[in-house]
Amino acid sequence: MTPIVRFESVTKTFSSGKKTLTAVDAVDLTIERGEIFGVIGYSGAGKSTLVRLINGLERPTSGRVVVDDVDITALSESKLRHVRAKIGMIFQQFNLFRSRTVAGNVAYPLVVAGWPRQKRRERVAELLEFVGLSDKARAYPDQLSGGQKQRVGIARALATSPDLLLADESTSALDPETTQDVLRLLRKVNRELGVTIVVITHEMDVVRAVADRVAVLAEGRVVELGTVFDVFSEPQAPASKSFVSTILRNRPEPADLERLRSRFGGRIVTADVRDGSRIGDVLSDAGGHGVRFEIVYGGITTLQDRSFGSLTLELVGPDDGVDDVIRRLRTVTDVEEVQA
């Protein structure tokens, strides 16, 4: 893959009186053409500023932003408009014109671009069919559900056939079921149209559902960058660990361990699970050592066709047998025994 967006030592500061706020701090980042790239961070992490730097709505204080091999940092406003014509944008609050029909909203970028009326009609019909709203062409936004409004927003963003789609908290105002519908549509946009998508979010579930790679932002800096599988399965930065813990509770917390120790009389161990770790082979042989086991906590997650997680086990049997099972587990994965 080749880059479609590059941040080269980009810093963006804002001044308020005598105070200076650093919203984006020395960011180096490459987004590859054709991928779905997630940017996640808590409120104030710099996510929205980052996306505004991509479409030139903000200029960096220092560094370069390169979009489709064009350094947009010092472009004039007129030249920036040509770059923005290849960038679509969808928003949290949809930003539809209430006085225009669904078809009118989708057609708006084409009107601005000077498309002839008949070509506009054909393109709008094509897009509404793509997003599953052909029957809503004459409806108005107030007659639509939240999910339908976002579908209109996606169709409008695709009107001029952009190479890059920026989705800024595009599912934050939706219920969980509708969120999944919209995410499926974004995957369809990426897969069938080849559009690169940058998903800005504070929800790790969104990243897990659609992204190929993810950057974790904290205080304006990229504190972790990698495939979604790597960041989920082995988060390194405190911010990454915090996000992952909100949706994956594979390892017991101290309070959970206290409860497990009081409930189960055997020895308690937590073993990491990775593809090919062969934990099952070790456990299937445990009976031969006079040891029985029970899974008392944990879970396995499949992501990008790979599995990871952890299992907390009670091992019951003679000490030498349990010791041997733990020793064998440690030859295939990381194991931590809970001390009594």
From Swiss-Prot:
It catalyses: L-methionine(out) + ATP + H2O = L-methionine(in) + ADP + phosphate + H(+); D-methionine(out) + ATP + H2O = D-methionine(in) + ADP + phosphate + H(+). It is a peripheral membrane protein. Residues 5-244 form the ABC transporter domain. SMART domains: AAA (SM00382), NIL (SM00930). Its EC number is 7.4.2.11. CDD domains: ABC_MetN_methionine_transporter. Gene3D superfamilies: 3.30.70.260, P-loop containing nucleotide triphosphate hydrolases. Pfam families: ABC_tran, NIL. It comes from the Bacteria. ATP binds at residues 41-48. Keywords: Amino-acid transport, ATP-binding, Cell membrane, Membrane, Nucleotide-binding, Translocase, Transport. It is found in: Cell membrane. One of its GO terms (cellular component) is plasma membrane. The keyword Cytoplasm does not apply. Belongs to the ABC transporter superfamily. Methionine importer (TC 3.A.1.24) family. Part of the ABC transporter complex MetNIQ involved in methionine import. Responsible for energy coupling to the transport system. The complex is composed of two ATP-binding proteins (MetN), two transmembrane proteins (MetI) and a solute-binding protein (MetQ). This is Methionine import ATP-binding protein MetN 2. It comes from Rhodococcus jostii (strain RHA1).
